[in-house]
Amino acid sequence: MLSKYLDRIDFSSYEDFKKNYKVKTPGDFNFGFDIVDGWAEEKGDNRALLWCDDDGNEKCFTFADMKRLSAKAANFFSEKGLKKGDVAMLILRRRWEYWVAAVGLMKLGVTFIPGTLQLTKKDITYRANAAGVSAIVCVDDEYVISQVEESKPDMPGV
């Protein structure tokens, strides 16, 4: 996989790395398909993501899991009307779903903006209008939902 995108992966020094490190990406490069799904094809059972929270909960995802879940997310977002060139805002806390949504959006060619839970109505409205956001994906949190709902009348593109 690495040799597909890198001429070299071993370097003798930092100076050698700075001088010779080059990433090759084709014009139609898509991180979701080319990297995540590529690793799933080569090493599907390898760990791609280990998520944990402050309460000690853990969830492990393989590359095969990420391929499958991100494809489902991409299909869901596509059914909701998102398409290449659109912009979405993700307000998902530090949840594992963030990574599935992010890769799913990448597969569609949708640019995404991560947002903190501390965003207010004013912050959400400004970011959505400035970036041309057409969708907001947010966590099931009373405060976040209230701020997004209150922002909706001032975000005609969402």
Could you say what each language-model-derived stretch is?
Residues 79, 103, 107-158:
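Structural core segment of the AMP-binding/adenylate-forming
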